[in-house]
Every structure is written in C-alpha cells, then in structure tokens.
Amino acid sequence: RSLVGSEMCIRDRKNIVRKEIPMGSKTLVLETGKIARQATASVIASMGGTVVMCAVVTKPSAEGRDFFPLSVHYMEKTYAAGKIPGGYFKREGKPTEIETLTSRLIDRPLRPLFPDFYVDEVQVNCMLLSLDKDNPPDVVALMAASAAMSIADVPFRGPMAAARVGFINDEYVLNPSFAEMDESDLDMVVAGSESAVLMVESDANELSEDLMIGAILYGHQEMKPVIKQIDEFAKEVLPEKSDFTNPNEEEEKKIFSEVSEQCTAGLSEAFTTTDKKERGEKISSVKEALLDGLDEELHNSYLKQFKEVEKHIVRENILGAQKRIDGRDLTEVRNISVETNFLPSVHGSALFTRGETQAIVTATLGSGRDIQTCLLYTSDAADDWFC
C-alpha cells in the first residue's frame, strides 16, 4: 500500500513545473501541477512568505452569446496571516473592500488581452494562502493570474506582468515592503504586456507629472524580463495552444458593410445633434429601421456591427472635424455649476452639475466613536481607515 502511494507521489512530481523568476531584489516563484488539478489551469505564485493560488476555469459559450463573461474573484483568508476574524462573526463573510478592489485590479489588465470573438465563460479565482510583512499580495495575485491564464488553452494574448513602484528619498523602489510603503511618496501598481502598459493604479503625495510618467516607464521596464520568464514557464507547461480564430469573420465583415451602407447617413446626422435625448431618439430610429424585416435570430449579429459603425463614425468625427458628439472641441470643458447647502438638515451638501450629468454630494461629521475599525493582516493593530 505504501509502495503504491510512493509511486503515485513520484508520478505526481513529474507533472509539477516550477520556475523561479528574479524581480529586482526579490524572487517570484511560479508552480503548477500540485494543487487544483481539475481546474483548466492553476498556478501557485509566491514572493517571500506571501503565497497566492490562482485557478482558472473555462466553460464553452452558450448559443447566441454576444459578450465575454469573464469574472475575477480575489479572496483573502485570515489564516494567511495567522489571525481570526474579529467581531461577532468568526467566518469570512462578504468580500471586503480591498478584495473587491484587488479583483478589479486583476480584471483590468486581463480583459483587453482576449479577442472580441471569444465568448466562452472564464472564471479566475485568486486566493491568498500565506502573507508575510514584506510582500503585498496584490502584485503576486496579478502574476499568478497571468501565469494561470497563459497555461490555459484559451486565446489569451499575454502574458502580462505587474510591478509596484514606490518613490523614497528621490529614488524609485521596485516592489517596496509594507514598511517602505509607509515612507514612500508614491504607491503605484503598473501592469502591462511586453509592448504596452495596460493598467495603472496609484496613490501619491504631490509629485510632478514627469515623476509619475517616469514611475510608469520604470515599472514597465522592470516587468519586461518577468514577462519573458512567464512565457517560458507557459511554453514548458503547454508547448502549443489550440488555433483560435474567429469562425464568423467573413460573415461579420459582410454584415458590417451592409450596416455601414444602410446606417451611416442616419447615424452621422444623429451624432451632430447636441441634445442628448434627441440624439438618442434618432439613433434608436436608425436602429429600428435596420432591424425591421430581419429575422429575430439575426438581431444580435446586426446590433454588434451597428455598434462598430457607431464607433467608427464617432472616431472619424473626432479625428477629422476635431469635434465631440455634443459639439465641443477637444479642449473645451462642459459648463460646470455648484450649489452648496442643497439639503437643509444635512451637515454638508452640494449639487454638482456638469453638462447633463448631476451629483448630489453629502458630508456627515461624527465623533471618534463612529470610526470604522478593521483588523490589519500585516500587524497587531487595528486600522481606522475604511477597509
């Protein structure tokens, strides 16, 4: 019995692929084949004592689907930092604010790397398994997601990588620790492919535009070697991917030509109408005329190309006539008005209007008893900032 178990263990080890990738003064470790084997692809990424597992699962598209159902979920487990959830509830509940924001952080650079024709369902699940006090998990999660997507048999035009950039003592710092971030004038996360920056997220003190642009370029330059290493890792795991091509390419070109011929004149007139409501009515009229007489099963195909024609006309107007939809030139700002004390019994209120967009904004003052506190994973203190 033990011999069989040993043979299974040896066989399992043969399927494990591990790669160590230098990144500045730190090392990113990618490993696959050990955990979550039933997923389409899974990767465990670690940097120091911070470990994130990412599992990607795909499902064939439903008939008639015309959008890409990609969902990204990032989850933090309190055991990762050796802590127990505080308060009345001792189990993890709904996603925290940081989990939601990190999920979006991962989603934004992944989504543009899929072709428009790909509509299979894709779920990306990242879970923080271990956390040290030197390596924030969001960048590690981004790398894990990129690596997992790269070894999945999907038309992912990656890989991509990410880097955190700090600015301490007039110098850029790559992937600063939590302690270094407390001293930094900049907390920027940059993600991108080898050829382009795909996402930038930052908090900063007052820094010049040149310093901010320099931070983006610095982060992108530092991640390029990592992208090549992730690509090598992916090719070792999955030497060849399936040949993904758009099966409806010729048909879509034909429909686009038909829609363009029928709708360009009406849409061009609509996009010179400055009133938003009237413009919407004209666009709806053109759309109804297009769909009139078509079989219902063709509606989605024609509506998709209708959107493409809309984008083409708006783009041509901006580049050619240097005018936006509402008649403004490219440097003109909408009319702005502000009315304060908009609500009589509220501590502070304002009505902000810009063009046809409005916002009612309120402020309420409270005492120290009203502060929201939450347990920090990285220290024994409680944070009085929103979490």
PLM regions and their residue ranges:
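Extended amphipathic alpha-helical scaffolds
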Residues: 13-59, 64, 245-376
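Alpha/propeptide regions of enzymes that mature by internal proteolysis
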Residues: 16-17, 40, 67, 93-115, ...
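Mobile "lid/hinge" segments at catalytic clefts and subdomain interfaces of large enzymes
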Residues: 155-267
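Conserved mixed alpha/beta core segments that line enzyme active sites in large multi-domain catalysts
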Residues: 16-24, 29-31, 127, 132-137, ...
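Gly/Lys-enriched N-terminal cap/neck module of very large, oligomeric protein machines
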Residues: 33, 39-42, 123, 158-162, ...
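Generic secondary-structure signature for well-ordered alpha-helical cores
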Residues: 77, 111, 115, 150-154, ...
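Single conserved hydrophobic/aromatic residue that forms the stacking wall/gate
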Residues: 1-10, 377-387
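Glycine-rich, flexible beta-strand/loop modules in the N-terminal catalytic cores of phosphate-handling
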Residues: 39-123, 128-135, 194, 201, ...
